[in-house]
Amino acid sequence: EMFSNDDDRLRFTQFLLTRCYLVVVSTPSQESAFRIFTVMNSRGLDLLPTDIIKSTVIGSLPKEKQQGYTEKWEGLEELTGRDGFNEVFTHTRTIFVKERQKKTLREEFEEYVLKTVSPEQLIDDYLVPYTNAYVQLKNCEFTATHHADEVNGLLFWLNKTNNSDWMPPAIKFLAEHPNDSEYVLWFIRKLERLASYLLVTAQDVN
């Protein structure tokens, strides 16, 4: 809300100076700080693992690159929504680690992803193509001159399964072969059959 005049701005400033308190909480580790914030944050947006990862990644960039990459990061987040962007990071972790998550997303992302790629590589080579692939897969919006309807029909059923285990391999494949619609159709068809079989037979692949 915008202030209409100087008196309103003055009253607001006086309120901040006399009625608001700044509380500083010190913790021994980033993990404990995250837990404390989650418990104490009764208002406002929840702090997601991606928020912490963002501060680490953007903070590691040279000063002259931070603004540009911040805008690129926020553009991707706007494309998916905060929760959707968090899912992209979960699937990216799975692509790198190739096994079930054993610790927190933030811990494993820092250990297995951030230590193997530079901040620029993470955003340009992984987050950008993986986010674009995620949006197409999640929304059944694969576009191509051939086979788009067939692919999107299969994606509709994949999204109906009771898990998202199919998403990481689909993201990686689509990100690496965005312009080969025939190959994408072949892969998604095989993936849908596998996912359906595992669902119907209640196979445990953990």
PLM region descriptions:
Residues 1-206:
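Flexible coil/loop and intrinsically disordered segments
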